[in-house]
Amino acid sequence: MDNHNSSHQLYKKAMALVLAGGRGSRLYNLTDTRAKPAVYFGGKFRIIDFALSNCLNSGIRRIGVVTQYKSHSLLRHLQRGWGFLRGELNEFIDLLPAQQRVDEEHWYRGTADAVYQNIDILRSYGPEYVIVLAGDHIYKMDYSIMLRDHAQSGYKCTVGCVEIAKEEAYAFGIMGIDENRKITSFIEKPKKNAPTIPGTTDRCYASMGIYIFNSDYLYDLLEEDITNKESSHDFGKDIIPRVVSENQALAHPFSMSCVPRGEGIQPYWRDVGTIDAFWEANLDLAANMPELNIYDKDWPVWTAQEQLPPAKFVPDRNGNHGVITNTLASGGCIVLGSEISKSLMFSKVRVLAGCKIDQCVIMPEVVVGENCRLKKVVIDKGCDIPAGMVIGEDPIEDAKNFYRTDKGVVLVTKKMIDELKEK
C-alpha cells in the first residue's frame, strides 16, 4: 500500500480532540472575557483556527473541541465559522463543554480529566487512534504524517516535540530520547539538568502538547489515572511520564511534519502564552518574508468569515496622505491620513487623522482618535482610544494606566480606557 493510501486509511480511523478549555492567565486581561484559544491572532483569525485548520488540511475530519473557561466567544466562533463539515460523510466538529458527565461533582480538573470526562463520547465514535491537541499554539503541521509515524512504530503513544534551546527548557515538558526516538525520560518544566538531544549539549526536545494514542491504551490510562488521588490528572505531569515508564512513548520531531518542511526551512511553532510572545508572533506576520506563511493556498488557515467591505486608506480632510508600511489590515478598516508601520489591524478598525502607529496589534472594532501616538501596544476589541493619547513612550505612565510588560509591550483594554476616562 503506498503512503497516500496508507495515510488515507489511517486518518479515517482517527479522531482529534482539541483541548480548548484553558484560561491562559499569562495573557492577563486578554482572557478576561474569552478562553485563550479564542483570542484573536494574525489580523483575522483566532488561535484555535490553526489547530483546526491543521486537522482539516491533514484529512482529519472527526474533531471534538473540549471547552470550559469562559467559552461563549469560542463556541460562537466555532458555530459561525466551522459549521461546514458534512455530518452525512462522517465529518464533524463536536463541541464538548464541561458538564460533569462522569461523577456530577467535578468540572475539568486537568487536561487528562477533560478527556476522561468525555470518554463515553469518544468510545461511541470508535476511533482506533486518538489525536490529542492543544488548542492554543500557532503552527502548521500535517498530522497525517505523525499519525503514519505512530502507526508504523508499534508504540502505543507518540508525542510531538519541537527543538528548543536548553536555557528555555524550564518553561516546557522536556523529553530525553534514544537513537531510535524512544522517549526514555520526561520532565515537566525542569529547573536544571534538562535532558538534551543526542549529539548536542545545548538543545532539547520540548513537548508540543500533541499526542497520538492507540485508543484502547488511552482509555486504560485515563481510567487508572482518575482513581489515583495523588494525580493532578494532567497529560504532561501524569499521563506521559506513566507511558514513558512503560516504554511505550515515541518522540515525533516537528521537523518531520511541519508545513512547509525541507532542507533549510526552520519549523515555525509559537506558544503565545504571554503578552510579549503574543505581540511578537503577531508582528512576525508583518515582516517582508514572514516565517509563518498565511498565504499558502495548499495549506490554508480556515476561520469564520464575516462579510465586510475591503480596507480603505484615504487622505484626511486637509488632504494629508497617510503612509502604511509592513502592515496587515483586515476587512472593514478605514484609515485617514495616518502613519502606520509594522502593525496588524483586525476587522472594522478606524484610525482617524494624524496618528502615528508603530508595532501595534489592534483588535476588531477599535477606534483610534485623532493625533494619537501608539508604539508597541496591543489593543483589545472594542476600545475607543481618545484623541491625542500617547501610549508606549512613557513607561511610568503606561504602567500606571495600563498593563506594561518588562519588554515594554503595553496592553490596553476597554475597561482600562473607561477607567482612565473617569479619572
UniProtKB/Swiss-Prot annotation:
It comes from the Bacteria. It is an enzyme of class 2 (transferase). Its EC number is 2.7.7.27. CDD domains: ADP_Glucose_PP, LbH_G1P_AT_C. Pfam families: Hexapep_GlmU (PF24894), NTP_transferase (PF00483). GO terms for biological process: glycogen biosynthetic process. Pathway: Glycan biosynthesis; glycogen biosynthesis. GO terms for molecular function: ATP binding; glucose-1-phosphate adenylyltransferase activity. It catalyses: alpha-D-glucose 1-phosphate + ATP + H(+) = ADP-alpha-D-glucose + diphosphate. InterPro entries: ADP-Glc_PPase (IPR011831), ADP_Glu_pyroP_CS (IPR005836), GlgC_bac (IPR023049), GlmU/GlgC-like_hexapep (IPR056818), NTP_transferase_dom (IPR005835), Nucleotide-diphossugar_trans (IPR029044), Trimer_LpxA-like_sf (IPR011004). Alpha-D-glucose 1-phosphate binds at residues 108, 173, 188-189, 207. SUPFAM superfamilies: Nucleotide-diphospho-sugar transferases, Trimeric LpxA-like enzymes. Keywords: ATP-binding, Carbohydrate metabolism, Glycogen biosynthesis, Glycogen metabolism, Nucleotide-binding, Nucleotidyltransferase, Transferase. Homotetramer. HAMAP family: GlgC. NCBIfam families: glgC, PRK00725.1, PRK00844.1. Belongs to the bacterial/plant glucose-1-phosphate adenylyltransferase family. Involved in the biosynthesis of ADP-glucose, a building block required for the elongation reactions to produce glycogen. Catalyzes the reaction between ATP and alpha-D-glucose 1-phosphate (G1P) to produce pyrophosphate and ADP-Glc. This is Glucose-1-phosphate adenylyltransferase. It comes from Francisella tularensis subsp. novicida (strain U112).
